[in-house]
């Protein structure tokens, strides 16, 4: 409740316009065009509860388009297992809450798997957006050797295993996506070790 109140105070005081998109139980909020200087030009939120907006006076709500990346990520965050992983991975750096690299990779992997499945099912999903998540995960995997391991279980582990297997048969040119000094085999072995996928 305190966090929600702080968010709404920021939105109200900044004079933001409010937009929202909702589908399949997911809720995404975007606040733009603050009237007061010094406020972030955009705030984006993923809400676990669709009633987040209810009872808020002085907030105008208008529908916005939610693209594949946003709807996929919001759906992931609304999944209890991924939401718990998200909370587990938050750390504070210089007073700012950030998500550790070892926690970002599973989200990128899941977004890739979801968008790929939707595209294969016939949905109109841009192939470039599908590939982007995979490439992002592989770029970030270069940093996993410096991170502590994350013990993934259940669907989280299954999804990461599926991503690793997909990469094993894929044709990503690592040099072209900015990965230097590591082979695909080395990256995938690092992932397996980081996320407890060995054995």
Region locations from a protein language model:
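Compositionally biased terminal segments of proteins
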Residues: 1-199
């Amino acid at each position: 409740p305190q966090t929600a109140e702080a968010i709404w105070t920021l939105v109200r005081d900044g004079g933001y316009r409010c937009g929202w998109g909702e589908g399949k139980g997911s809720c995404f909020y975007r606040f733009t065009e603050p009237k007061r200087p010094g406020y972030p030009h955009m705030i984006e939120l993923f809400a676990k509860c669709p009633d987040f907006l209810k009872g808020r006076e002085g907030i105008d709500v208008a529908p916005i388009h939610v693209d594949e990346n946003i709807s996929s990520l919001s759906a992931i965050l609304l999944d209890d297992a991924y939401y718990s992983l998200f909370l587990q991975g938050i750390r504070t750096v210089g007073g700012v809450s950030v998500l550790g690299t070892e926690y970002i990779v599973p989200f990128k992997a899941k977004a890739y798997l979801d968008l790929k499945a939707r595209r294969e099912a016939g949905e109109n999903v841009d192939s470039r957006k599908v590939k982007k998540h995979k490439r992002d995960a592989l770029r970030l995997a270069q940093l996993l050797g410096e991170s502590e391991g994350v013990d993934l279980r259940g669907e989280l582990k299954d999804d990461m295993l599926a991503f690793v297997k997909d990469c094993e048969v894929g044709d990503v040119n690592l040099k072209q996506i900015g990965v230097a000094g590591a082979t695909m085999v080395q990256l995938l072995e690092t992932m397996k070790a980081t996320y407890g996928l060995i054995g």
